[in-house]
A protein has these predicted regions:
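Copper-binding active sites and cupredoxin-like electron-transfer domains
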Residues: 25-505
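N-terminal secretory signal peptides that target proteins for export/translocation
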Residues: 1-8
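Sec-dependent signal peptide recognition
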Residues: 8-16
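N-terminal signal peptide c-region/cleavage motif recognized by signal peptidases
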Residues: 20-24
Length: 505
């Protein structure tokens, strides 16, 4: 009883002391460590990706060799909502991911992925819009101008992240051996404040994914409005993947929460004048990268059947789609293409506070990198003013290409359409399909199973890697288009939909 009386006597004093303390709270958090156990050395700003000369560890015990492969890569994105202007001029309500790091890179059509030292430089820009009409209240003139650093201030994350989404989402590109930290911050549903939508990131096709980072809400974390979560990945085998939100996938994919992702092979980092067959053999010294065709039916990169003695740097080639060991996936220029579709009725119902009809979902607007023809051939780098008056990058990724005759083009094609199969055809430039779903088309004996065609067909959730070789192709404009006539329009009689141009000079 005495203790209770003492407690009551001191309670008012304790409460007064608590009132005097400063209050602080922050749910947005961004993570990008400069070093880890796998990558103990800091890569300074401006560093190139480390060369691949030997495994970082050998044998089952992973004995360190002193060689550090790959790097720490980071990227930051927002999840929210907004509107898109479709090719018929209508405003379409959408959900979307947007950039919160690498804004300068993304505005120029490049991946927003950066090494840790560049990512961790503070973001500092004088204006919120590219037209330089809306001053940024958090701008610090005393600090260097930096459009690519991560945005970590909560107020700035809202200033930049709201109404700043794109379809497809910010492009992600990493290398084999990289550790990748991806932070997603949920900035809320500004146009539908009645919605308390959670968002996640699902790395589609990631093998043996940890459920904690897989983005499926039943077994992992879902990010509430005002919260952040950092996903961690050790880069998988090279190939073309994609990513999307895994909250009610038919809805969130249909509404636009889809993005492109590809992993570059170690072979790109092999020193000049190295035999690619020998370099691929070197990977067999590390159990983490070894490909034992006699014991592992999932071996992704078997050695070629014959050593072609292709040397790194031959005819200037240092870029490949896969660890092929024979140079057969070499390319000069790459163009990531993501196919997507909109059902305008589904989006309209979602905008007007009504229950959405999943059984009746049927896409009628078809997109290449977020564009329908004729916008597919418009130059990248355009801007669109949102309802808040801020002009933001609009579809910064190009969906057309201009090349010199003789160059090899790598098309990284993925399909995130929810309701339709999609076909793309190329007339005049033959297609060589080299990979399906991030797996090189090669049997376990090392025989390449590539095939030539003039059209490819994908279902939602599939990817293809295609080489277009312009050797012997006459200069001119060539079309990449769908032969499905109802997909070659913008829900109208005139041409539109899935069509773009490749110009050979």
């Amino acid at each position: 009883m005495l203790r209770e009386q003492q407690y009551r006597r001191w309670l008012p004093t304790i409460l007064l002391c608590l009132v005097a303390l400063p209050a602080s709270a922050q749910s947005f958090r961004v993570q990008c460590p400069p070093t880890t156990n796998l990558h103990p050395a800091v890569l300074p700003v401006g560093s190139q990706d480390p060369a691949y000369t030997a495994p970082a560890a050998t044998g089952q015990t992973s004995t360190p060799t002193g060689v550090v492969n790959g790097a720490i890569k980071c990227q930051e994105i927002s999840g929210g909502d907004g509107y898109a202007t479709t090719a018929d001029g209508n405003q379409t309500y959408m959900f979307s991911f947007g950039p919160l790091s690498g804004l300068g890179l993304i505005a120029s059509g490049q991946p927003g992925t950066q090494i840790a030292s560049e990512f961790n430089l503070p973001y500092n820009a004088p204006f919120l819009d590219l037209a330089a009409t809306k001053p940024d209240p958090t701008y610090k003139p005393s600090l260097p101008l930096n459009m690519n650093g991560a945005i970590t201030d909560p107020a700035e994350m809202m200033n930049v992240g709201v109404m700043n989404g794109n379809i497809p989402a910010p492009l992600i590109a990493i290398n084999e051996d990289d550790e990748f930290f991806l932070t997603l911050s949920n900035v809320g549903m500004i146009m539908r404040p009645d919605l308390f939508e959670q968002h996640t990131v699902h790395f589609h096709g990631y093998p043996n994914a940890s459920s904690y980072y897989d983005g499926v809400p039943d077994a992992s974390i879902a990010i509430n409005i005002g919260g952040s979560f950092t996903y961690y990945y050790l880069a998988p085998d090279a190939g073309t993947y994609f990513w999307h939100c895994h909250i009610t996938p038919p809805e969130h994919l249909q509404m636009g929460m889809v993005g492109q992702l590809y992993v570059r092979p170690r072979q790109n980092r092999v020193p000049l004048n190295t035999n690619l067959y020998t370099a691929l053999q070197t990977q067999q010294l590390d159990l983490r990268t070894a490909c034992n065709v006699t014991a592992d039916i999932l071996c992704a990169t078997p050695l070629p059947y014959v050593n072609t003695n292709f040397i790194q740097g031959t005819n200037g080639y240092t870029k490949y789609a896969y660890n092929d060991g024979d140079g057969s996936t070499r390319y000069d220029v790459e163009l990531p293409i993501q196919i997507h579709g909109f059902d305008p009725n589904f989006h309209f119902v979602g905008m007007t506070f009504n229950p959405e009809g999943f059984a009746d979902m049927k896409d009628k607007h078809f997109l290449l990198n977020g564009r329908s023809y004729p916008d597919t051939v418009a130059p990248a780098g355009q801007t669109t003013a949102a309802s808040d008056g801020i002009s933001r990058p609009s579809q910064p990724m190009s969906s057309t290409l201009t090349v010199k005759a003789g160059q090899r083009i790598l098309l990284r094609i993925s399909d995130l359409d929810v309701s339709e199969f999609q076909t793309l055809a190329s007339l005049g430039i033959p297609m060589q399909v080299i990979a399906l779903n991030a797996r090189l088309l090669r049997d376990q004996a090392g025989n390449n199973l590539y095939y030539n065609t003039n059209s490819i067909t994908l279902g939602g959730g599939e990817s293809l890697d295609v080489i277009l070789d312009t050797t012997g192709v006459a200069p001119g404009t060539y079309f990449l288009f769908t032969p499905q006539l109802d997909h070659l329009s913008n829900d109208a009689e005139n041409f539109g939909g899935l069509m773009t141009e490749i110009v050979v000079q």
